[in-house]
Structure formats: C-alpha cells, structure tokens
C-alpha cells in the first residue's frame, strides 16, 4: 500500500503489553506517516457547512461485505471477530485521485472515510464537529433484510467515503467521468439528525458524545 500510494511510512508500533486479564489490546499495527500539501487552501476537514449536499461514494455494499472488526460489533456484542472487508488498491487509488482533484478544484468542502463507525457513525462525527444537522436517506427501498441494513449503516467498508459539496451537479458528472459509484444521501442544515424515519436533537447527541469519558468516570 505504501508503494502503491507513494507514501513514506516513518514508524510503526504493535503493543501486546498494555492489557489485563479482562481486556486485550487488539494486535493492530499503528503506523506513523508523513504527507506534504503544497497549498494550504487544498486542506479540508471532516465537517459540514450549511446547505451542503451529502454523497456516499466508492465501493458498493454486497453480500460479501461485512461488519467484522467494526465499532458496531464491539459495542453491541462486546467482542471482535470476522474478517475486515477486502481491500481494493486500484479502487482506492482511483477514489483518492478523484477526491484530491475535486478538493483542488474547490468542489468539495468536507470528506471522511467510514473506517470508524461506518456511514452513520462518520456522518454523526461530521455533524458534531460542524454543529450542523442533516437529513439523509441511508437505506434504499432494496434494503430488505437486517444484515444489509447493518452493513449500510455500520459497516466499516474499505473504499467508501462521505463527501460534502455545494456543487452536486458538477461533482456527480466528475464522479461519472472517473467511473466512481455514488449516492446522494441528503443535505446538511438545522439542528436535527434525521435519517430513515429517525429524528434526534443534534445538541443532545453531541453532548452525550463529547462528555462520554467524563460521564463514564462519574465526574
């Protein structure tokens, strides 16, 4: 992967010692990497702006997709198992090239992968950091079983990204040109989190999220 993307890996660490009888540290490698951005105007954050359109782009959910190793699996079942989704280097290269080009053209204002919490978790993080709500349809009419719904909402699928833009028509044509699958999920506005029949108050959810460690410690 380092060679494919021409990115230097300058350090790495795997810890097997910071654990106790009740909890084990996952044997996941932590990598230190360096990057260079020649123009600070091309730096964007994982956030929304008022009236942004939300797109989910990249790999489609299939029967082979899974929620193995995901935050959803850890929280709801208190264990981690299964295999992560298959990594497609060629797709990732095409996706990143397209996203970087759109950023350099000032056509997208925010972007985030779904590697922590899946699509729903990533959307919530973007909303919390922006203090802007959203209204989205994340499940389509073809989603007819719970397994598929869980994958769409919580699957930490490689090759799936969320992008926010004010120029949806241009972005759609550019994605089509670069053979990138996309789905217009919704729009950013207000102080509510709305998706597929659910509605939550942004401020209340944000406070729960931001104060979770303090609350867990009983402070």
Residues of each region from the PLM?
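Glycine-/charge-enriched secondary-structure boundary and capping motifs
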Residues: 1, 5, 10-29, 104-219
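Mobile "lid/hinge" segments at catalytic clefts and subdomain interfaces of large enzymes
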Residues: 25-89, 100-103, 158, 166-167
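Polyanion-binding loop/helix "lid" in catalytic or ligand-binding cores
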Residues: 80-120
């Amino acid at each position: 992967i380092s060679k494919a993307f021409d990115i230097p890996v300058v350090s790495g660490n795997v810890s097997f010692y910071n654990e106790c009888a009740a909890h084990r540290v996952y044997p996941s490698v932590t990598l230190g990497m360096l990057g260079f951005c020649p123009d600070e105007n091309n730096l964007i954050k994982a956030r929304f702006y008022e009236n942004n359109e939300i797109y989910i782009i990249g790999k489609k959910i299939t029967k082979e997709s899974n929620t193995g190793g995901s935050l959803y699996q850890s929280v709801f079942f208190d264990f981690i198992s299964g295999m992560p989704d298959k990594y497609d280097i060629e797709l990732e290269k095409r996706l990143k090239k397209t996203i970087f080009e759109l950023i350099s053209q000032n056509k997208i204002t925010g972007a985030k992968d779904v590697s922590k919490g899946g699509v729903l978790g990533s959307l919530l993080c973007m909303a919390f950091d922006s203090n802007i709500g959203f209204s989205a349809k994340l499940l389509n009419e073809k989603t007819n079983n719970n397994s598929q719904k869980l994958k769409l909402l919580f699957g930490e699928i490689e090759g799936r990204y969320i992008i926010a833009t004010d120029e949806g028509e241009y972005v759609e044509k550019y994605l089509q040109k670069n053979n990138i699958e996309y789905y217009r999920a919704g729009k950013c506005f207000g102080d509510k989190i709305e998706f597929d029949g659910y509605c939550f108050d942004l401020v209340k959810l944000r406070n729960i999220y931001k104060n979770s460690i303090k609350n867990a410690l009983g402070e």
